C-alpha cells in the first residue's frame, strides 16, 4: 500500500484558529474528524497523526512553526517516512481564488504565499500536489492583514461546505488520480 503525506498549512495557536490563512489547518482538521485520525502527536515541529483513509496509508501534518517556516516541518516528515514529493499533498489558502472555491494544482510557484515559499526553499522543488482553498482578495486594505483576519460571518455559514469539498477533492486525488480530480474540481 502506498502512503501519502497530507499537510495543512496554517499558523499555530488559538489566535489564528479561524483566520483565512489557516484554511489548510481547517481542511486537515475536517479530514481528521471524518477519518477518525487524531492529529495530536508532537513530531516534525508540528502535530501529526497517521492511519488508513481512502484505501491509503496517510500521514497528516500541521506544522507548528508559523507559516513562513513550514517547509522545515514538511521536509523533516518526508525524510522520516522516506516519501518523495510525488507522495506529498499540501492544502493551503489562496488569495487568487474566490471564497468558496477549491482548486487543485500540481507544481507551480509560491504566488507570494510564505508557506509555499518556505516549502520551495526547504524541498528544493515545488513539484507536489496542492489543494488551494479560495479565500478571495480584500477589496481595500493590506493583504497581510486580510489573511490574518477571521472569516466573515457570512463566510463562516458556508465554511463547512468548503471544507467538505476540499476533503472530497483530496479523496478523489488519492482514489482516481490528479488528472481526473483536476478535471472535476477545477471546472466548478
Curated annotation (Swiss-Prot):
GO terms classed as biological process: protein quality control for misfolded or incompletely synthesized proteins; rescue of stalled ribosome
GO MF term list: peptidyl-tRNA hydrolase activity; tRNA binding
Gene Ontology CC terms, in alphabetical order: cytoplasm
Marked site positions, Stabilizes the basic form of H active site to accept a proton: 93
Location within or outside the cell: Cytoplasm
Swiss-Prot/TrEMBL keywords: Cytoplasm, Hydrolase, RNA-binding, tRNA-binding
Site (Discriminates between blocked and unblocked aminoacyl-tRNA): 11
Positions annotated as active site in the UniProt record: 21
Residues given in the record as tRNA binding sites: 16, 66, 68, 114
EC number: 3.1.1.29
Enzyme class, broadest EC rank: hydrolase
Family: Belongs to the PTH family.
Xref: NCBIfam families: pth (TIGR00447)
Matches recorded under PANTHER family: PEPTIDYL-TRNA HYDROLASE
Oligomeric and partner information: Monomer.
Protein role: Hydrolyzes ribosome-free peptidyl-tRNAs (with 1 or more amino acids incorporated), which drop off the ribosome during protein synthesis, or as a result of ribosome stalling. Catalyzes the release of premature peptidyl moieties from peptidyl-tRNA molecules trapped in stalled 50S ribosomal subunits, and thus maintains levels of free tRNAs and 50S ribosomes.
Protein name per its UniProtKB record: Peptidyl-tRNA hydrolase
Natural source organism: Citrifermentans bemidjiense (strain ATCC BAA-1014 / DSM 16622 / JCM 12645 / Bem)
